[in-house]
């Protein structure tokens, strides 16, 4: 159905490393529920910020819009990432 993974970057910063929802569940509340669970886990672990990397290609437009609707804003590369024209970096203060 769905999965996600968080990666600790430092004491107050985590990365939403992956988040996937099965095709049969896209457009349902599943993605929102998974994201809310991930945010709750990040907060419970003491994170003050959560960041993610997604693609810039048209295929990733729905994902970027989803994250924007949930308060994520564009940011600079974080962690071990470097500027990449195929990557979109986003962050959310928790």
Where are these regions (language model features)?
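Acetyl-CoA-dependent GNAT
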Residues: 1-13, 17, 22, 35-37, ...
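Residue-level detector of intrinsically disordered, flexible termini
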Residues: 4, 29, 43-46, 57
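Short strand-loop junctions, especially beta-strand C-caps/beta-turns
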Residues: 19, 24, 55-57
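Conserved acetyl-CoA-binding loop-helix of GNAT-fold acetyltransferases
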Residues: 21, 27-44, 65-69
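C-terminal "cap" of GNAT-fold acetyltransferases
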Residues: 46-70, 75-94
